């Protein structure tokens, strides 16, 4: 079933929807399909923590996500509101919005699966940790970080900073300090119990690392994002630098690529794994952790229910068959196996309903299967708002016709949404429904002639909908966060619905 929806992404504390952007070429076709197959083969997950946009170790993120298939999330304490602006006059909150969008753009290159922010505000440059803790309140920062860890539920935390004077900026030191403390706090249901009452569950990551170590110091893991990726056409570090160059308010778009190793050194500072499973030196962040899907319950430290192993093995077999059938010339050759894996995953989700931690990871796998299928099939979809009654251009110059002009809409106004869908893979698809998900009080009704329900490869299927805004729809959108006064060092979350 292919169901297309249009709507607003849910923002939880500071979760930003990266899917709002058009995919990069490297995330489509054969390259994109292969990278999504890598993600299906593992349950590895990492959360990288920083203080500001552009602090992140982008090469590390790109290597983890695109090179190993790990799920990668990025938690950035603030939005860099007190930085400089190389592009224009916007400063403070306005600059924070610009830097947020720049980071989300860069995240595409890093391969970040989820971007989070806390409620703290960049109040200006400070070399002192105590000033940052005084401005923000350590417990406030810790509460936000624990909430994000409990929301994302990563296996490993990797802090960009160490939490000491080597980090320089007081914001940097706070990010390092709080990450290490949040490692244990997130797994303790007695810490911030109001989050548990809201429906979150305590979550204990398995290991936490700090960055910024040097080759001649005590380090645990050495990573080389300078490795060349034939799927990207450059190294992971260079691909990440392309993303970093889009944070133009800070770097004016400068881009410097460099071949060769790009080593980064990270030190493990805490773990809940037994000493026998880890060593002074590790090859990866996941040494001592079985990241195969069949080991899901073992890795989650949960008793495996009867029949679970057979279900997990069925999913894994489907993934491995999809990998073996993968073809650069026809990525959709993997789709039949992926479809079986998706069905098996959905069955497992239903079977393990009493195991919420396992269901959480399996529902993530369900989404990964859907993404892999859509990418392998070359699925494209677009929904365009236009004035009601707009007709499609015809004739030999139709492809060069300008798009219809759609001005701002007001409460109670009716307009049209034209949805176009195409699947360009070899397997046939059947369209059960194309629908719009609209806002509260809005109405949407189908219009236009019905198209084929089993289109040929690359055949475009269109649907038109008449949409009427609610009479009490807000006249403008607004962020889900605000501060009452410029002196406030933390945002208040508001209902932006």
Mark where each language-model region is:
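Eukaryote-biased detector of low-complexity, proline/serine/threonine-rich segments
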Residues: 454-497
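Active-site rim/loop-helix segments in enzyme catalytic domains that contact anionic ligands
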Residues: 20-151, 173, 177-184, 188
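Short acidic, flexible loop segments centered on an aromatic residue
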Residues: 424-441
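The feature marks non-catalytic terminal segments
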Residues: 22, 32, 185-388
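Bacterial N-terminal signal peptides
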Residues: 6-19
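Short, solvent-exposed loop/linker segments at the N-terminal edge
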Residues: 390-394, 399, 404-413
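Short beta-strand elements of extracellular/lumenal beta-sandwich folds
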Residues: 407, 411-426
């Amino acid at each position: 079933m292919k169901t297309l929806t249009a709507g607003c992404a849910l923002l939880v504390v500071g979760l930003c929807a990266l899917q709002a952007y058009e995919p990069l070429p490297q995330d489509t076709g054969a390259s994109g399909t292969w990278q999504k197959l890598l993600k299906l083969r593992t349950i590895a997950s990492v959360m990288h923590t920083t203080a500001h946009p552009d602090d992140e170790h982008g090469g590390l993120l790109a290597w983890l996500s695109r090179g190993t298939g790990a799920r990668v999330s990025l938690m950035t304490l603030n939005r860099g509101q007190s930085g400089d602006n190389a592009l224009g006059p916007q400063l403070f909150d306005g600059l924070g919005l610009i830097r947020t969008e720049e980071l989300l753009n860069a995240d595409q290159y890093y391969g970040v699966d989820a971007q989070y922010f806390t409620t703290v505000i960049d109040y200006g440059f400070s070399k002192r940790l105590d000033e940052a803790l005084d401005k923000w309140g350590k417990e406030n920062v810790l509460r936000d970080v624990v909430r994000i860890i409990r929301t994302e539920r990563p296996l490993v935390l990797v802090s960009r900073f160490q939490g000491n004077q080597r980090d320089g900026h007081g914001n940097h030191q706070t990010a390092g300090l709080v990450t290490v403390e949040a490692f244990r706090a997130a797994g303790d249901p007695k810490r911030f119990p109001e989050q548990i009452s809201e429906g979150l569950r305590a979550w204990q990551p398995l290991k936490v690392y700090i960055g910024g170590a040097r080759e001649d110091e005590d380090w645990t893991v050495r990573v080389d994002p300078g490795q060349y990726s034939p799927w990207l056409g450059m190294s992971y570090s260079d691909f990440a630098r392309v993303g970093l160059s889009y944070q133009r308010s800070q770097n004016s778009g400068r881009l410097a690529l460099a071949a060769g190793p790009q080593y980064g050194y990270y030190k493990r500072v805490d773990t809940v794994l037994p000493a026998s499973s880890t060593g002074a030196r590790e090859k990866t962040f996941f040494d001592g952790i079985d990241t195969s899907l069949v080991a899901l319950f073992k890795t989650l430290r949960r008793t495996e229910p009867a029949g679970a192993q057979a279900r997990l093995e069925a999913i894994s077999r489907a993934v491995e068959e999809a990998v073996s059938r993968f073809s650069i010339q026809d990525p959709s050759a993997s789709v039949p196996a992926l479809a079986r894996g998706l069905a098996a995953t959905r069955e497992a989700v239903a079977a393990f309903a009493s195991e919420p931690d396992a269901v959480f990871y399996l529902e993530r796998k369900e989404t990964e299967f859907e993404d892999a299928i859509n990418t392998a099939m070359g699925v494209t979809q677009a929904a365009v708002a236009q004035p009601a009654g707009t007709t499609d251009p015809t004739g030999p110059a139709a492809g060069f016709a300008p798009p219809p002009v759609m001005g701002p809409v007001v409460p109670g106004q009716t307009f049209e949404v034209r949805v176009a869908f195409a699947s360009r893979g070899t397997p046939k698809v059947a369209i059960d429904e194309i629908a719009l998900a609209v806002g509260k009080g809005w109405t949407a009704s189908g219009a236009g002639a019905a198209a084929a329900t089993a289109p040929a490869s690359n055949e475009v299927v269109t649907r038109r909908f008449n949409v009427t805004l609610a009479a009490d729809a807000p006249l403008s959108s607004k962020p889900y966060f605000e501060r009452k006064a410029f002196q406030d060092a933390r945002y208040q979350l508001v209902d932006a619905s």
